[in-house]
């Protein structure tokens, strides 16, 4: 946009002059500033600008504002727990400073309209910061109740005149120093809002019912709720834990959460619930144990008498959460992402780790103390240990996928790119592997399975390669795909660690290695030295090497073995049993 300069009447355009509580983008005459010794109030820390602007307003009738001009760039905060911008400090510090700024501004304001504007701003600040649905509202109210009493007395005329009846009652109680009753009214406002959602049958009525009725007494000890990849499918470690428990503890109540329950078949007696339905919220309210392999929504209230088992979904190669320097994802910032992730991991009672390498990373990336980490291997990998040589089982998988029995199977499973997003939670992926060249080189003897990351939203166009390339992105069990694959091609995906259990050839197609290592996530390990197979940045050399699997196996055997020892040796085929028995024991002790 073009730089735009506009002139305003200082007395008539109060909102334009003061609305952002900032002196930025306003041109001040230095002669006036010097003549009247106008300065920022050094007793304020964050909300200092009004102290300068209001003094300046006393001596001018007009002012100039510049739009669309980048006066400065503010660097991004990478660790919101150690380094904060002024606006991201602890709420208690910020609110105290805002209140001090308000009183300072009131003293400086001589124009009645300016005073009214400042008072309105303070009223809006209270309404926003002490909104009854805030997760820490109880702590906020108790910490600042004396300040709220003082402000209510000062602002009562404005507040009572502009508030709804229920808000007026809260204000009057604060004015009379009855803070406990005022807080009850504050929470009653939330209750009324939920009741209104339910009565009017609004879209979020199920969530409102959950918020109103969820309590510790709801928890039923023999109820376990499972979810995989945010309800996408019946898969991964939660699947294998469930199947073990269904077999050995059939009398428990099992619930699976799905986005589309009708599209997922779950063996046994499990109930299926639709995500965000009334049954979904009831399941999470009643279950004594939650089992998930990815983050669950923060609006689900994990109570003290509930146990949350986080299986996670891979050995980390790319930096995670707290270890990421910069977060480039839609709908969030680095500080916001890390704070929300921290809130999530604080709810985990147990986190499954597949190896010592991962345990050390999880402690840092997820703010986890080691007592909560179970270093037992991934339940989803039990099948890789127990059935790798079960030929009848392998034939069943191949038959299900209609794979020719006389051809070798290549699996291509790339990861997603943080910066290639279309919207929050949805990412694009451009196939760079050159299917045409692979088909020409390998089509007679191989088929290739294409497995995109679960966050990838765009469908693959495989027109012309129907008998060679097969999209298995929606195949629920990736472990079964590993079992029938003669080799794996990946880039920075954690599938390399799971596939390493089989000690088969792996190829690494890292066409954007420089960007991914330095510009996006960064790696925990030495990518160029520690991998159990060759690395390619262009597709043609890759196609030639795929013809010689035995040669690659022999050439990299030492690295394959070292990779197995470091990352795969904990997997012993009994992780599902460990977690299933742990849950059973926990239930028995309740």
What are these regions (language model features)?
Residues 8-89:
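Conserved nucleotide-sugar donor-binding catalytic segment
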Residues 68-203, 247, 569:
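C-terminal subregions of glycosyltransferases and related glycan-biosynthesis enzymes
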Residues 166-281:
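N-terminal pre-catalytic "stem/leader" segment of glycosyltransferase-like enzymes
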Residues 233-246, 364-365, 379-462, 536-538, ...:
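Conserved catalytic-core segment of nucleotide-activated headgroup transferases in glycan assembly
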Residues 273-289, 295, 449, 454-497:
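Donor nucleotide-activated moiety binding/catalytic core segment of transferases
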Residues 290-319, 475-520:
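A donor-sugar binding/catalytic signature common to diverse glycosyltransferases
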Residues 318-421:
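A nucleotide-sugar donor-handling region in carbohydrate enzymes
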Residues 463-467, 494-567:
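Catalytic binding pocket for nucleotide-activated donors in carbohydrate/polymer assembly enzymes
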